[in-house]
Curated annotation (Swiss-Prot):
GO terms for biological process: defense response to fungus; killing of cells of another organism. It is found in: Secreted. Residues 1-25 form the signal peptide. GO terms for cellular component: extracellular region. It comes from Arabidopsis thaliana (Mouse-ear cress). Disulfide bonds join 27-45, 33-50, 39-52. It comes from the Eukaryota. Keywords: Antimicrobial, Disulfide bond, Fungicide, Plant defense, Secreted, Signal. The lineage of its organism: Eukaryota, Viridiplantae, Streptophyta, Embryophyta, Tracheophyta. Belongs to the DEFL family. This is Putative defensin-like protein 303.
Amino acid sequence: MKSNKATFFLGLLLVYAFCIMLIESRCYTNDDCKDGQPCPVPLACLFGSCICPWKSQSKLPICQIICANLD
């Protein structure tokens, strides 16, 4: 029984690590966040002093990036 719990939690940890890597790689390929750093917000990057959601597109005439100032 304990073996099953350990295997389950190990699998969960591996899935979590894979998701973090996937999110960070999306940050680097996103035009809005080319020079950004990975951050813990899902599908987001640091962009200047703001957090940019991955789906935002700064190339639009009116910038639609939703920014949150970092404290």
